[in-house]
Each structure stands twice: as C-alpha cells, then as structure tokens.
Swiss-Prot record:
Originating gene: rplC
SS bond list: none
InterPro entries linked to this entry: Ribosomal_uL3, Ribosomal_uL3_bac/org-type, Ribosomal_uL3_CS, Transl_B-barrel_sf
Xref: NCBIfam families: L3_bact
Region (Disordered): 133-152
The family this protein is said to belong to: Belongs to the universal ribosomal protein uL3 family.
Stated name of the protein: Large ribosomal subunit protein uL3
Amino acid sequence: MSLGLVGRKCGMTRIFTEDGVSIPVTVVQVESNKVTQIKTTETDGYNAIQVTTGFKKRSNVNKPMAGHYAKASVEPGRGLWEFAIDNASDYEVGASIDATIFEAGQKVDVRGVSKGKGFQGGVKRHNFATQDATHGNSLSHRVHGSTGQNQTPGRVFKNKKMAGHLGSENVTIQSLEVVRVDAENGLLLLKGGIPGSVGGDVIVTPAVKS
C-alpha cells in the first residue's frame, strides 16, 4: 500500500479546460495530516504510519486517546487512520502530510462510506424486476417472491438477495484522475464522483491499477 491522505468530501462542481470542455469534479478538502505513530516490523509486526486530521475538543477525547496524542505532541483529531508503507521509518512523529504528494494527471483510488439508505426492498436494493401491475396481482407488486425450495433443503440459502439495509458500506472507486491540486487551499479536484455524503471522510491513495 502507498502513502495517501485523509480528506473530507466537499461536493461536486465542474471546471472548464482551455478549449471549453466541461469536466465534472469532486472537491476534496485535505487538511494537514499529522503523523501520530510509526509502526515497524520489530515493534508491531508490520510497517505503517498512523495519521490524524481535523480537530476534536479535548473534552471529547478520552484519557487513553488524549495520552496517545500527547505522546506524539499532536492536537487531537477527528480520527486515526493507517497507511501500510515499506518506508515508514523515513517519517517522524508529528510530521505533516499535505495535498502536494499528488499531482495533476495522476490516478488515485478513493475509499469512503456510501450514503445510508436505511431498510430497502429488493427492487431498490438489488434491482429486482417488479411483478405485474394488474392481472390478478394484489399487494405484491414489489415483493421479491420465492426465497427457496420446499422440504429439501427446507431453508433459505445464505447470501440470498432479499430486502435489508442498503448503504453505509465501505466503497472504493478506482483510478480517478486528479484534475487539479490546490496546495494553497488544501484542495484536490478529482474527476467524477466519489462515495459518501458531503462532509464525510475519504481516503485518497495512489491507484493500484494503471
């Protein structure tokens, strides 16, 4: 895994190229990511750096986490994230990582938590077809129908597509293009859409696929 950044989704807009082509982009605000811990094979069994970003009131931080931040001499952030990298020892606790690790034209992967839709039926959740609107059908227009067989096997198989909770899952969008890097304002402009609601945290890393 490569070094990445934790940012916050600001929403979508569009920018125009010099020849008038409109490009839809998602704006990701990247506040300074502070290194809170260096993990190595000798001490933790793997190499990684732990980072935090944002701000959290000290009154909302429990004592163990307050001690963790104090040990790193870093102000409490809104969470902790890790990036598994081979050269973790090249970084120091308290160091800052900003949007300049990316450049325009680079491909990145973006991970986030998809929008929660609550409990949904099979038509919306799994794109099932609806049943007949008329011809003797009553109250079953959007029912998913049979879920299994009869006495054998006498049960519903695991992973059967049925109604249930939709969204609020970890989703990765791969190979999005970095259209622009605004280091002064801490912004990344990524071509296309990314998972999650406005204000949600996203993790941006170099693309694993070219």
